[in-house]
Amino acid sequence: MTANEKSVRTETGKVVSDKMDKSIVVLVERRVKHPLYGKYVKRSSKLHAHDENNECRIGDTVQVQESRPLSKTKSWKLVNIVERAEKV
């Protein structure tokens, strides 16, 4: 990696909202060790991501990568859909 080349952050999560045009909300869960008790606790973050073709649906597992700010809350882009949700 050169001096002006950055590594791109990517996260995998589940789509919890696709109601906006060209945007999705992705829930990313991680496990963190509690500093005092040592138990692993689930922590989650909701990321607003750009979905250019409106191809994601609620329940899909997707991979997103960090990008420049696209709006007030949106600074992630959809990379690919890992797994489609089952149709009910």
Swiss-Prot record:
The protein's name: Small ribosomal subunit protein uS17
SUPFAM superfamilies in the record: Nucleic acid-binding proteins
Originating gene: rpsQ
Keywords associated with the record: Ribonucleoprotein, Ribosomal protein, RNA-binding, rRNA-binding
Pfam short name (any one): Ribosomal_S17
Role: One of the primary rRNA binding proteins, it binds specifically to the 5'-end of 16S ribosomal RNA.
Protein family membership: Belongs to the universal ribosomal protein uS17 family.
InterPro entries the UniProt entry points to: NA-bd_OB-fold, Ribosomal_uS17, Ribosomal_uS17_bact/chlr, Ribosomal_uS17_CS
GO MF, any single term: structural constituent of ribosome
UniProt-listed GO biological process terms: translation
NCBIfam families: PRK05610.1, uS17_bact
GO cellular component terms attached to this protein's record: cytosolic small ribosomal subunit
Superkingdom as given in the UniProt entry: Bacteria
Subunit annotation: Part of the 30S ribosomal subunit.
